[in-house]
């Protein structure tokens, strides 16, 4: 069974204030702020996605998938901002705090993935239509609406990549606190012969 390593405080590692721990904390803070701009840009573009003519008025709020992506971008921007402020604080990363950050990063990543996937599918149908379901493509007539929604989806996927990398970072931070499991019998034999 894996045992937790003794955690070393980031403050203790910093020493004089210069070192790899401080640089890593600054990098993580900046990297957690990057999705804020991306998510807000995607959110604003989605909110501005509207077009009307004499037959129909299209708005992002008419399409559940686009509303879902707008909510996901808002939630993820807020989380990213809060987690960036949290990463600025020089405190030790205890196992419980690392688990919470890991699980939240995973949840936010999956939220962005789900919102982006659903919006991409709806956008695909809007561009191509679906003959079997007799759904006509609408982007030929409502190009401005589709272009803004499409740009929002693309920016959301860039934010998703940032959240994926943050998930990897938090996973590394969490699981590096544990000893590796005993592999096969080689390590067990070494321990047995050392006791003899």
From Swiss-Prot:
The chain crosses the membrane at residues 27-47, 69-89, 99-119, 149-169. Keywords: Cell membrane, Membrane, Transmembrane, Transmembrane helix. One of its GO terms (cellular component) is plasma membrane. NCBIfam families: A_tha_TIGR01569. Homodimer and heterodimers. This is CASP-like protein 2A2. PANTHER family: CASP-LIKE PROTEIN 2A1, CASP-LIKE PROTEIN 4A4. InterPro entries: CASP/CASPL, CASP_dom. Residues 1-26, 90-98, 170-196 are cytoplasmic. Residues 48-68, 120-148 are extracellular. It is found in: Cell membrane. It is a multi-pass membrane protein. Belongs to the Casparian strip membrane proteins (CASP) family.
């Amino acid at each position: 069974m894996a045992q937790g390593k003794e955690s070393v405080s980031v403050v203790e590692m910093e020493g004089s204030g210069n070192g790899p721990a401080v640089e890593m904390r600054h990098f993580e803070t900046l990297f957690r702020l990057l999705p804020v701009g991306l998510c807000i840009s995607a959110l604003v573009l989605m909110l501005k996605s509207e077009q009307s003519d004499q037959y129909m008025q299209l708005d992002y709020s008419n399409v559940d998938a686009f509303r879902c992506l707008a909510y996901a971008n808002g939630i993820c921007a807020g989380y990213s901002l809060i987690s960036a402020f949290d990463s600025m604080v020089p405190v030790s990363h205890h196992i419980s705090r690392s688990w919470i950050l890991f699980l939240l990063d995973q949840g936010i990543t999956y939220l962005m993935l789900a919102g982006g996937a659903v919006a991409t599918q709806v956008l695909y149908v809007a561009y191509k239509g679906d003959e079997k379901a007799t759904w006509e493509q609408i982007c030929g007539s409502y190009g401005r609406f589709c272009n803004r929604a499409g740009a929002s989806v693309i920016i959301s996927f860039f934010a998703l990549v940032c959240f994926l990398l943050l998930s990897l970072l938090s996973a590394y931070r969490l699981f590096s606190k544990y000893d590796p499991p005993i592999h096969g019998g080689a390590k067990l034999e070494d321990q047995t012969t050392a006791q003899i």
